[in-house]
């Protein structure tokens, strides 16, 4: 039977990871290793300056752990290299995240980081996120659509094989709409997220300042001279976006021009 490792950045008790397990439990043997507490926007952080403690969850056949103060990357690293080191995983899936991970969000995202860590460890990986309404960020319409999409995607992978080669992963974003309103999937590049750079300054009872970094509505910039619509465009039209991500961040188009710019300085 196929074996899938699940993680997230919303925490072990989050509704999204429970919905993900429910969607896949009849398709594969499911293992879950997730942070004990929410670790949203922790990016690719791993813990190297403090010990990590893994708590085995009772009644889960030894397949569930939560990691005290662990990040998604910690969870996947520990799962593959220690907790389940004798298990050969067919997939790592991170999610279902509460909120989008599109455009530059993928750099900040702990959800995407969990899938990146799976890729680094040599396992085909997927990150999946559920878009929330700007009017009510805490209540997605439901996970029904996200569950259907991940079931179909995983079944396709089991049938045809993982579609990417090398150090690459799939990033999936699911629109906040009903199954009836859903328009299907689009294969998209990342778009450009617009950040308003909000900082909220407050004063505590001791008259000391503290800050909350701003969270703002989903806004994006149109890609210029692009044949394909972006992940943002797909979501805006009630499509799911499926974006292939590459761990290699090198800007190959700029290597030659950079050499020319740097000519005379290179030895």
Swiss-Prot record:
InterPro entries (alphabetical): SurE (IPR030048), SurE-like_Pase/nucleotidase (IPR002828), SurE-like_sf (IPR036523)
Question: Has the keyword Ubl conjugation been applied to this entry?
Answer: no
Q: State the family named in the UniProt similarity comment for this chain.
A: Belongs to the SurE nucleotidase family.
Q: Which cofactor does it need?
A: a divalent metal cation
The EC number(s) given in the record are 3.1.3.5
Q: What is this protein called?
A: 5'-nucleotidase SurE
Signal peptide, first to last residue = none
The UniProt keyword set, sorted, is: Cytoplasm, Hydrolase, Metal-binding, Nucleotide-binding
Q: Name one Pfam family in it.
A: SurE
Name the residues that span the membrane: none
């Amino acid at each position: 039977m196929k074996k899938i490792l699940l993680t997230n950045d919303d925490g072990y008790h989050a509704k999204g990871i429970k919905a993900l397990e429910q969607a896949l439990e009849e398709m594969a043997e499911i293992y879950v290793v997730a942070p004990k507490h929410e670790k949203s926007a922790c990016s690719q952080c791993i813990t190297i300056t403090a010990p990590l403690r893994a708590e085995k969850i009772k009644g889960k056949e030894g397949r569930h752990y939560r990691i005290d103060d662990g990040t998604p990357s910690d969870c996947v690293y520990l799962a593959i290299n220690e907790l389940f080191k004798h298990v050969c995983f067919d997939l790592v899936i991170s999610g279902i995240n509460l909120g989008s991970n599109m455009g530059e969000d993928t750099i900040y995202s702990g959800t995407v980081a969990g899938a990146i860590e799976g890729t680094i460890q040599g396992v085909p990986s997927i990150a999946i996120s559920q878009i929330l309404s700007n009017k009510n960020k805490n209540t997605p319409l439901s996970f029904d659509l996200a569950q259907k999409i991940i079931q179909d995607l995983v079944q396709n992978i089991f049938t045809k094989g993982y579609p990417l080669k090398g150090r690459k992963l799939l990033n999936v974003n699911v629109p906040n709409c009903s199954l009836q309103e859903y328009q299907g999937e689009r294969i998209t590049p990342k778009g450009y997220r617009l950040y308003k750079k909000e900082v909220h300054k407050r004063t505590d009872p001791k008259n000391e300042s503290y800050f909350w970094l701003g969270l703002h509505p989903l806004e994006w910039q149109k890609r210029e001279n692009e044949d394909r619509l972006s992940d943002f465009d797909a979501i805006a039209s009630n499509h799911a976006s499926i974006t292939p991500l590459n761990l290699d961040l090198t800007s190959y188009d700029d290597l030659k021009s950079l050499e020319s710019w740097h000519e005379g300085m290179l030895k």
